[in-house]
Swiss-Prot record:
Keyword Magnesium set for record: no
Protein task: NQR complex catalyzes the reduction of ubiquinone-1 to ubiquinol by two successive reactions, coupled with the transport of Na(+) ions from the cytoplasm to the periplasm. NqrA to NqrE are probably involved in the second step, the conversion of ubisemiquinone to ubiquinol.
The family this protein is said to belong to: Belongs to the NqrA family.
Listed GO MF terms: oxidoreductase activity, acting on NAD(P)H, quinone or similar compound as acceptor
Name assigned to this protein: Na(+)-translocating NADH-quinone reductase subunit A
Organism per entry: Cellvibrio japonicus (strain Ueda107)
Alphabetical keyword list: Ion transport, NAD, Sodium, Sodium transport, Translocase, Transport, Ubiquinone
Enzyme Commission numbers on file: 7.2.1.1
GO terms of biological process kind: sodium ion transport
Swiss-Prot/TrEMBL catalytic activity: a ubiquinone + n Na(+)(in) + NADH + H(+) = a ubiquinol + n Na(+)(out) + NAD(+)
Pfam families: NQRA_2nd, NQRA_N, NQRA_SLBB
InterPro entries per record: NqrA, NQRA_2nd, NqrA_C_domain, NQRA_N
Keyword NAD (UniProt): yes
């Protein structure tokens, strides 16, 4: 077991009840372009077309053979683009239950399938895009093989669902999914789980179960990769979420694409925080209707640390998100706040009197408590960075765009979520996720 001691468990109110209920029915779903790094779509449908569940919507111009399929049966109601025609989302009005059929196998035969058979079914169904490479967090090229595959079956994000609860309800599908993943690599399939978790076992001598404990980011794939199989410019691993492993298992045994998603609907502004059963790409306005407390609320697809604000063309559940967080917009300014003891305020540096009450939780808002300013190295990054890197030096190199130094300091191991805590504790209010992504894009483009 690997114990993470440096990090942060955010003391936020609104933790979800860990039991699954059916969520409000959604009438719209969408695929969001920003969920797929560097993807350039070639559309296979247009507005007004009727599509089936699992039908191709578009292909990736940059990665030959990768297609993106419909998460519902219905009608394409909108294709949204932004400045310079950047793809935002493709929206489908859910109607009927028509679905494409894919190759189906008996559970007993899965361990005997070839890597080519597994890959073909995943690519044709669109589930291939559930994998993300590290470095760069892109969909892998069909035909490629990773050094290892990481299954994220632990989640330490604030307000997250307990993966063990969701996996227990689909134990056979999860085990079948692991068996299939083992066919895709000659290396290890690392199933990263919480301490004392008893997850279903797949068939494959290369499947390894690794336990992590401690504070967030103990559940991040970046943390698992760093300790178990670090990457480099010449070494690639893949990551995949536990609910996608379940979907893979069900695809092969039923021949039908499973788009069910269990998400944690939680946060200080949620009336009844709990786990709800919905579907991939669900419209979050419809999912949260009648579920929130009064006030100006911000609905977030994903974690409060690194999720995406739900608004306009992006009012949908992200492809890789398993929670919907809701915070009150923090627009009010507090007079003479610097003279107050801060009983109802939180600080990583322990400068408020609330530090004397370690079990206290808070109604966090969206306020950043200040504007952007110079980066000040006061030791806050080191408090929340569990990886064996120099965070202050790395962040400085990212800010100034020194990609050579950033690579030497370990930026290729990282994704946006791995720097989310650094953003949260930053005295200068920098958003390190987008800064990291800009540097990674430059590194990849420059070869």
């Amino acid at each position: 077991m690997i114990k993470i001691r440096r990090g942060l468990d955010l003391p936020i109110n609104g933790k979800p009840n860990q039991s699954i209920e059916d969520g409000p029915q959604v009438r719209q779903v969408a695929l969001i372009g920003f969920d797929y790094q560097g993807m350039k779509p070639t559309m296979a449908v247009k507005v007004g077309d009727r599509v089936k569940l699992g039908q191709e919507l578009f292909a990736d111009k940059k990665i030959e053979g990768v297609i993106y399929t419909s998460p519902a049966s219905g009608v394409v109601s909108a294709i949204h683009r932004g400045d310079q025609r950047v793809f935002h989302s493709i929206v489908i009005d859910v109607e009927g239950d028509d679905a494409l059929a894919f190759n189906q196998y008996a559970a007993a035969d899965l361990a005997g399938l070839s890597a080519e058979q597994v890959q073909q079914n995943l690519v044709q169904s669109g589930l291939w895009t559930a994998f993300r490479t590290r470095p760069y967090s892109k969909s892998p090229t069909p035909g490629s093989k990773p050094h290892s595959i990481f299954v994220q079956a632990i989640d330490t994000n604030p307000l997250a669902a307990d993966p063990a609860v969701i996996i227990a309800a689909k134990a056979d599908a999860f085990a079948n999914g692991l068996t299939l993943l083992a066919r895709l690599t000659e290396g290890k399939v690392f199933v990263c789980q919480a301490e004392a978790a008893n997850l279903p076992k797949g068939q494959g001598a290369n499947i390894a179960y690794e336990s992590f404990a401690g504070v967030h980011p103990a559940g991040n794939p970046g943390t698992h990769i760093h300790y178990l199989d670090p990457v480099s410019a010449s070494k690639t691993v893949w990551t995949i979420g536990y609910q996608d492993v379940i979907a893979i298992g069900e695809l092969f045994t039923t021949g039908r694409l499973n788009v069910e998603r269990v998400v944690a609907l939680a946060g200080p502004q949620v009336d009844r925080p709990r786990l709800v059963r919905t579907r991939l790409g669900a419209n979050l306005d419809q999912l949260t209707q009648g579920q929130l407390k009064a006030g100006e609320n911000r609905v977030i697809s994903g974690s409060v640390f690194g999720g995406r604000r739900s608004f306009g063309n992006l009012t949908f559940l992200g492809r890789f998100h398993t929670q919907v967080s809701v915070l009150l917009e923090g627009r009010e300014r507090e007079m003479l706040h610097y003279l107050r003891a801060g009983f109802n305020k939180f600080s990583v540096m322990g400068i408020f009197i609330s530090k004397l009450f370690p079990s206290k939780t808070f109604d966090f808002t969206t306020s950043t408590n200040g504007s952007e300013r110079a980066m000040v190295p006061v030791g806050s990054y080191e408090k929340v960075m569990p990886l064996d890197i120099l965070p202050t030096q790395l962040l400085r190199s990212l800010i100034v765009g020194d990609t050579e130094t950033a690579q030497k300091l370990g930026c290729l191991e990282l994704d946006e979520e791995d720097l989310a805590l650094c953003t949260f504790v930053c005295p200068g209010k920098y958003e390190y996720g987008p800064i990291l992504r800009n540097n990674l894009t430059r590194i990849e483009n420059e070869g």
